[in-house]
């Protein structure tokens, strides 16, 4: 929005030309989202406390979690608000990729909001009925997937980028829709499963978003895309603004979510952030890269799948509790140790993922 205004004002003062620089807008997008979230934090927390929107804790969870009961939840509202406002201010409104991310972000945020509302108001730990949650998540994912397929079929926008192989980029055809669906829905749920400890989900999200900001910049630059042997996508550059907004909003939220947390993001935050990372990976054609950089989310999800599968097939559990971060808690690891070690692993995976762009 401000970019368009600056384009009209540049004729009166050349200094407004700085708004056309992607790097400048990326930095101010991060700072805008950061300051909004820091400003909203105390106010939202106080309001949630006034409404008694406190966290509902499972009775079969680790005993250390019982002290979290009543901590304000639905803090994801401040994350979403910060991201949306920052993106609308600093990204080109005419860019379709930006609107795809906002559509999934807000859509999944709405699903998460309803889920959280049922938990905190009706005191129902299950929240929104699972089939309805997946119905709405699937509808949102399929809507954007079909739209992208119709507008991009037969172009690099629907190719599959395979790590380590620079000349292997097959056209997916209609399978693009299926892949996009699983990536968006899967990532939304993966981040949701990871959000079980103070700050555990938000920092990996920030790191992955930061990694995708670099990838988006390279993908939207013809010279760098050619150098890295990845598809050049002319709309991809503006995703840098979206990614840096996620980083800024995430860091602002972490200020209040770090151990011991003053607020939890709730499903309104985790589903939205996961869906956003998923659609960003789809738009950049970097689904495999998401698996690497978001390895913490992948492992958390696999631990649940393996735990449920093992119990149903063998009547035995693999882990003391799933997702796997609870397993380490029950082994006696202090919560901060689990959190920081997962952060370190996430940072390593993001760096490894970025390195694969060159190893081709």
Curated annotation (Swiss-Prot):
PANTHER family listed in its UniProt record: PHOSPHO-N-ACETYLMURAMOYL-PENTAPEPTIDE-TRANSFERASE, PHOSPHO-N-ACETYLMURAMOYL-PENTAPEPTIDE-TRANSFERASE HOMOLOG
Record's catalysed reaction(s): UDP-N-acetyl-alpha-D-muramoyl-L-alanyl-gamma-D-glutamyl-meso-2,6-diaminopimeloyl-D-alanyl-D-alanine + di-trans,octa-cis-undecaprenyl phosphate = di-trans,octa-cis-undecaprenyl diphospho-N-acetyl-alpha-D-muramoyl-L-alanyl-D-glutamyl-meso-2,6-diaminopimeloyl-D-alanyl-D-alanine + UMP
Protein's name in the database: Phospho-N-acetylmuramoyl-pentapeptide-transferase
Family stated for the protein in its record: Belongs to the glycosyltransferase 4 family. MraY subfamily.
Transmembrane spans: 26-46, 72-92, 94-114, 132-152, 168-188, 199-219, 236-256, 263-283, 288-308, 338-358
Protein species of origin: Cronobacter sakazakii (strain ATCC BAA-894)
Keywords, sorted A to Z: Cell cycle, Cell division, Cell inner membrane, Cell membrane, Cell shape, Cell wall biogenesis/degradation, Magnesium, Membrane, Metal-binding, Peptidoglycan synthesis, Transferase, Transmembrane, Transmembrane helix
Gene: mraY
GO BP: cell division; cell wall organization; peptidoglycan biosynthetic process; regulation of cell shape
Entry membrane topology: Multi-pass membrane protein
Known function: Catalyzes the initial step of the lipid cycle reactions in the biosynthesis of the cell wall peptidoglycan: transfers peptidoglycan precursor phospho-MurNAc-pentapeptide from UDP-MurNAc-pentapeptide onto the lipid carrier undecaprenyl phosphate, yielding undecaprenyl-pyrophosphoryl-MurNAc-pentapeptide, known as lipid I.
């Amino acid at each position: 929005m401000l970019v368009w205004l600056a384009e009209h004002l540049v004729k009166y003062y050349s200094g407004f030309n700085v708004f056309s620089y992607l790097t400048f807008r990326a930095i101010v997008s991060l700072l805008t989202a950061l300051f909004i979230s820091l400003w909203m934090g105390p106010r939202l927390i106080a309001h949630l406390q006034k409404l008694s929107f406190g966290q509902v804790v499972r009775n079969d969870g680790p005993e250390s979690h019982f002290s979290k009961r009543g901590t304000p939840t639905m803090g994801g509202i401040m994350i979403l608000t910060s991201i949306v406002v920052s993106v609308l201010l600093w990204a080109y409104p005419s860019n379709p990729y930006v609107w795809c991310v906002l559509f999934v972000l807000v859509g999944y945020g709405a699903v998460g909001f309803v889920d959280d509302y049922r938990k905190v108001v009706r005191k129902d730990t299950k929240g929104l009925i699972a089939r309805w949650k997946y119905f709405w998540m699937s509808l949102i994912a399929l809507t954007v997937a079909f739209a992208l397929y119709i507008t991009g079929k037969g172009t690099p926008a629907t190719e599959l980028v395979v790590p380590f192989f620079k000349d292997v980029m097959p056209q997916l055809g209609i399978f693009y829709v299926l892949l996009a669906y699983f990536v968006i829905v899967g990532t939304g749920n993966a981040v949701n499963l990871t959000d079980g400890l103070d700050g555990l989900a938000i920092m990996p999200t920030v790191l992955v978003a930061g990694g995708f900001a670099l990838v988006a910049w390279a993908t939207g630059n013809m010279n760098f895309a050619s150098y890295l042997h990845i598809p050049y996508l002319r709309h991809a550059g503006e995703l840098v603004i979206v990614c840096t907004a996620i980083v800024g909003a995430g860091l602002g939220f972490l200020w209040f979510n770090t151990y011991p947390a003053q607020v939890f993001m709730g499903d309104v935050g985790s589903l939205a952030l996961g869906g956003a990372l998923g659609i960003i990976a789809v738009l950049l054609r970097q689904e495999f890269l998401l698996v690497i950089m978001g390895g913490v989310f992948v492992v958390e999800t696999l631990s649940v799948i393996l735990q449920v599968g093992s119990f149903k097939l063998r009547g035995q559990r693999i882990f003391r509790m799933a997702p796997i971060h609870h397993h380490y808690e029950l082994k006696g690891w202090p919560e901060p140790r689990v959190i920081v070690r997962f952060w370190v692993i996430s940072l390593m995976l993001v760096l490894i993922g970025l390195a694969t762009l060159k190893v081709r």
